[in-house]
């Protein structure tokens, strides 16, 4: 009898831990993919910056610091403390919105030799993975709710024909914002993944 109870306990433990193991695997894949996208974003931005004169870099950086990224309309944690206090579902939903906001603009990214053609399909794959994680972490009553963030305004006339100076500024802003947002998503997914391991230290 004692042996049967022990065996039943082990089976129950394995079954109950299976969803956690699946989530950990999905999180590992998602984190790996966004890390790759973040590296691509850094490379694109670095390649573009290296093609500029020193004064051009200084002026563009000054302008960018006064501007906002299009994705700033997506409400996200303001600092690392708020990030750590946010729920897993909230971090996943914000990440989903950020990734989705780049599906169209990513087609217009440019900057040296970085393989930009890889970016759009990788964003789509990451978005699908995050959606699976959202579904896995939702309550049953919420399972059919829309995880998308509010509709993000378009990039205005970025895709229209622009003068040389304006085009340079817009390209700089687009690449800088893409790098910034991929860093955000990497941070949010890493923290959310860490939450699945109670013994882990999830401090940023």
From Swiss-Prot:
The modification Pyrrolidone carboxylic acid is found at residue 18. InterPro entries: 4_helix_cytokine-like_core, Somatotropin, Somatotropin/Prolactin, Somatotropin_CS. Its main location: secreted. One of its GO terms (molecular function) is metal ion binding. One of its GO terms (cellular component) is extracellular space. Keywords: Disulfide bond, Hormone, Metal-binding, Pyrrolidone carboxylic acid, Secreted, Signal, Zinc. Residues 1-17 form the signal peptide. One of its GO terms (biological process) is positive regulation of growth. PROSITE patterns: SOMATOTROPIN_1, SOMATOTROPIN_2. Pfam families: Hormone_1. It is found in: Secreted. Disulfide bonds join 69-177, 194-202. Zn(2+) binds at residues 36, 186. Growth hormone plays an important role in growth control and is involved in the regulation of several anabolic processes. Implicated as an osmoregulatory substance important for seawater adaptation. Belongs to the somatotropin/prolactin family. This is Somatotropin. The gene is gh.
């Amino acid at each position: 009898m004692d042996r049967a109870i022990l065996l039943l306990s082990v089976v129950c433990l394995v079954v109950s831990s299976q969803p956690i193991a699946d989530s950990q695997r999905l999180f590992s894949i998602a984190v790996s993919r966004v890390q790759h996208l973040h590296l691509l974003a850094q490379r694109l931005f670095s390649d573009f910056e290296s093609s500029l004169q020193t004064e051009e870099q200084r002026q563009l950086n000054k302008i960018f610091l006064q501007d906002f990224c299009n994705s700033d309309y997506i409400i996200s944690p303001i600092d690392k403390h708020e990030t750590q206090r946010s729920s897993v579902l909230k971090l996943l939903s914000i990440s989903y919105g950020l990734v989705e906001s780049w599906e169209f603009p990513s087609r217009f990214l440019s900057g040296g030799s970085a393989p930009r053609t890889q970016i759009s399909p990788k964003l789509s794959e990451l978005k699908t993975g995050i959606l699976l994680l959202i579904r896995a972490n939702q309550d049953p009553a919420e399972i059919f709710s829309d995880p998308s963030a509010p509709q993000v305004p378009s990039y205005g006339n970025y895709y229209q024909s622009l003068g040389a100076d304006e085009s340079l500024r817009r390209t700089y802003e687009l690449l800088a914002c893409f790098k910034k947002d991929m860093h955000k998503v990497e941070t949010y997914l890493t923290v959310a993944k860490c939450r699945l391991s109670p013994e882990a230290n999830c401090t940023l």
